[in-house]
A protein has these predicted regions:
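Eukaryotic helix-grip
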Residues: 1-189
Length: 189
């Protein structure tokens, strides 16, 4: 099931521009599900729409698709169909304990939705990594006149004792790089 703030994360109202690079716009807004602002990042790309969404769907290749995102392991626990799986990513950010993100993903054409799952067996976390209490979001690719527009939305709380301002700064720094990395990977396919 989708979290109560899912629709609010997906709509375009109430977002505040917090970071602008030459290629990526990053917006934030507060949602009731997390004390940390949700984020939306957008990039316009010459890469074909299908290649971008295909790259986002390759969770098991996250360490290659996102080489700058501190992902040290990723994979699929269970693939229900070509458009649905339960997966994981382990993030090991410097100075923090590793986090194990476990989530259900569904692909709807040119969009991917994911929502944290907490119904997995404890043996799927053998190293006892921290499990973030909030994690849901989406990838959406739309086709413009000459460019594809990739939009990434995420509401997350990594848990643990990390000051929120540090998380906000890190997100604003690494989200633009993440979108440029997925574009680079998709462009080589």
């Amino acid at each position: 099931p989708y979290p109560s703030s899912w629709d609010e994360l997906q709509n375009n109202e109430g977002w505040e521009l917090v970071k602008e690079t030459d290629r990526v716009l990053v917006y934030s807004k507060l949602l009731p599900d997390s004390p940390i602002p949700a984020l939306k990042a957008e990039i316009l790309s010459d890469v074909k729409m299908e290649k971008l969404v295909d790259a986002a769907w390759l969770v098991e290749k996250s360490t290659v698709v996102f080489p700058n995102a501190f992902i040290i392991d990723a994979g699929v626990y269970h693939r229900r169909s070509d458009s649905s799986y339960t997966a994981f990513q382990v993030f090991d950010v410097p100075f923090l304990s590793p986090r194990l993100y476990q989530f259900n993903s569904i692909r709807f054409g040119n969009s991917i939705h994911w929502v944290r799952t907490d119904t997995l067996r404890t043996e799927l976390n053998p190293e006892n990594h921290l499990l973030p209490p909030v994690n849901f979001g989406s990838w959406v690719v739309t086709q413009g006149e000459n460019k594809s527009k990739l939009t990434y939305r995420v509401c997350t709380d990594p848990g643990g004792h990390v000051p929120h301002w540090i998380i906000n700064q890190a997100n604003q720094r690494y989200l633009p790089q993440m979108l440029e990395d997925i574009e680079s990977f998709a462009g080589k396919k």
